[in-house]
């Protein structure tokens, strides 16, 4: 086994350890997330997506004082797809998962030819930025398997994540995006309500995060449109349309269920990433570099 292969195994093992430390709900956790039924809808994204959208049509959600759907509370972290957004078998202790991609139908990211080769290069040469404690970015932060809390005020929705102390402050008051020359790890989010659906327009990426630990990537031209719709009091249907004409051949979509954390004594833990961290030094010493982002061919 060469050093490069060993380094990748070390990286995977480190992430397995992090996942093992994640606080999990007491009931039903041995059941894979995609086999849990939500409002009589299968949890697997390809089946949950159309079923949940249909269920949401007849659900009247609880309301905030300003009559918006009340999504506040603690929610269980997204599906365990931060390792690989596409379908994959169990490997190095990482559980098997179905693809999060519901469009196109084959569940694959529709890369341009040069970008498909670039993805392979990323996996072979660079450390996962999230593994180096950089922000996960959008949409990855939504399917990292750590919990988060949603808070709402008139004109804002706030998502406070347990993972890496990240937070998203989403104005819903109609203000424009920040200037196009401002480039951010977590991008710039602007929300609006379309009926009972929170629609979030996300722009201004710096092109540095990955979609998962496999090197799946985007450029600074990334544009994401997220839609969050309550299916019942304890389930949110999440979908995101992902567009980057410099990297992909077409827009594509992911979808999955978000479940409420119903533990009455739940608290989000203080997340430590850099403190006492040594794996980054070990992996870096084996030749894996910090990902610089990509400059698409002209």
What feature does the model see in each segment?
Residues 2-13:
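Bacterial N-terminal signal peptides that target proteins for export
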């Amino acid at each position: 086994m060469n050093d490069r292969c060993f380094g990748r195994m070390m990286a995977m093992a480190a992430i397995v350890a992090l996942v093992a430390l994640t606080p999990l709900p007491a009931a039903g956790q041995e059941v894979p997330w995609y086999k849990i039924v939500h409002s009589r809808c299968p949890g697997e994204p390809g089946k949950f997506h159309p079923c949940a959208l249909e269920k949401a049509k007849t659900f009247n959600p609880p309301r905030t004082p300003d009559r918006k759907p009340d999504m506040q509370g603690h929610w269980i972290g997204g599906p365990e797809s931060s390792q690989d957004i596409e379908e994959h078998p169990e490997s190095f202790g990482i559980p098997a998962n179905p693809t999060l991609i519901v469009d196109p139908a084959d569940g694959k990211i529709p890369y341009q030819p040069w970008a498909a080769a670039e993805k392979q290069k990323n996996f072979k040469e660079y450390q996962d930025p999230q593994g180096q404690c950089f922000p996960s970015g959008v949409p990855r932060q939504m399917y990292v398997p750590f919990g988060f809390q949603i808070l709402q005020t008139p004109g804002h929705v706030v998502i406070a994540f347990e993972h890496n102390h990240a937070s998203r402050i989403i104005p819903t008051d109609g203000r424009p995006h920040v200037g196009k020359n401002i480039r951010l790890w977590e991008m710039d989010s602007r929300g609006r309500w379309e009926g009972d659906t929170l629609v979030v327009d996300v722009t201004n990426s710096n092109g540095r995060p990955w979609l998962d630990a496999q090197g799946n990537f985007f450029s600074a031209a990334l544009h994401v449109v997220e839609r969050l719709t309550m299916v019942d009091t304890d389930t949110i249907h999440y979908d995101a349309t992902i567009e980057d004409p410099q990297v992909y051949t077409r827009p594509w979509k992911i979808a999955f269920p978000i479940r409420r954390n119903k533990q009455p004594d739940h608290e989000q833990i203080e997340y430590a990433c850099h403190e006492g961290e040594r794996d980054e030094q070990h992996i870096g010493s084996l030749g894996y570099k910090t990902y610089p982002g990509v400059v698409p061919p002209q």
